[in-house]
């Protein structure tokens, strides 16, 4: 008869969790998913995050000229220099995300005679916990705070790459971002009306997803210097060097990708079209289009309809508090003597941006 493991200590339970991960061969558990892609937790955070500390994350940017330069006489010219405060500070506040799961000792005890069942019980709880975290973080990342009273939601890319002028064929018209209630706010603490050089690049495709879209895309690339880095991102796995995730990406809707692929199918390869259609990816100027299901639904205040969100992750990036990147903790349940709880915590900013004019751009059908 199997020995009971009821009444185990916290240390013993943590040992069981670790042993479960290390010793038992996983059996796949069926799980329905809310999304097909989880780029935030699978790619963006692991590869492009920066580790921070302090009360907030800050960077400095020059948004004004000193007015000290100019042509003058050849000799014995009196200096006329003025001291200007040209630096401004962009500030992103940290936000706290937490989720967890509960393990009941009785359930563990019931399955103690069957190693696979005991493993699957623990695994299923953990899978549900991690899926919940991935869902929540994906939605929050590509969204915005509900209102000025919302002090718990992070600010994502649409705090920095914003809607501009209706029918704009392409300019730095992206003004202050919107809360979900339609009111504006100043991402980073600096208003774009006061500092117009913080405005991001925006173009309105007016729903015309044809060759004219490529014209808008090409112009946006040139105006923002959005291009594939000369030095590729490489990573070594078990001594094998491979290309890592690219720091410049287009995120877009299914409708945009369908039309882009249609243009690619109809192109004359002998001419050497800029639009690629091979190797399982659709690319433009060597930059990949990534599907994001969230963009299949229009947003009045964030991005309009059928957006192309171009992001340079070396300029705009998530910041995570050091030692709090999905940090796990296990403890006894305070109100159930037969249970343990496991939590994962993430302290992060959402996105911080060093310079909105160089972070990418937004092309969409304006609301």
Positions of predicted regions on the chain:
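A generic secondary-structure signal for well-formed alpha-helical elements
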Residues: 133-144, 206, 221-224
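Short, glycine/acidic-rich hinge or "gate" loops at secondary-structure transitions
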Residues: 138-160
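Sequence/fold signature of self-assembling virion shell proteins
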Residues: 2-19, 24-38, 42, 154-233, ...
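Short, conserved beta-strand edge motifs with alternating hydrophobic and charged residues
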Residues: 249-253
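Glycine- and acidic
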Residues: 110-116, 366
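Short, internal active-site loops enriched in acidic
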Residues: 149, 254-258
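Internal, well-ordered alpha/beta segment that forms a basic, Gly-enriched binding/recognition surface
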Residues: 101, 105, 113, 119-137, ...
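Assembly/oligomerization interface modules of large self-assembling protein complexes
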Residues: 33-105, 160-163, 170-171
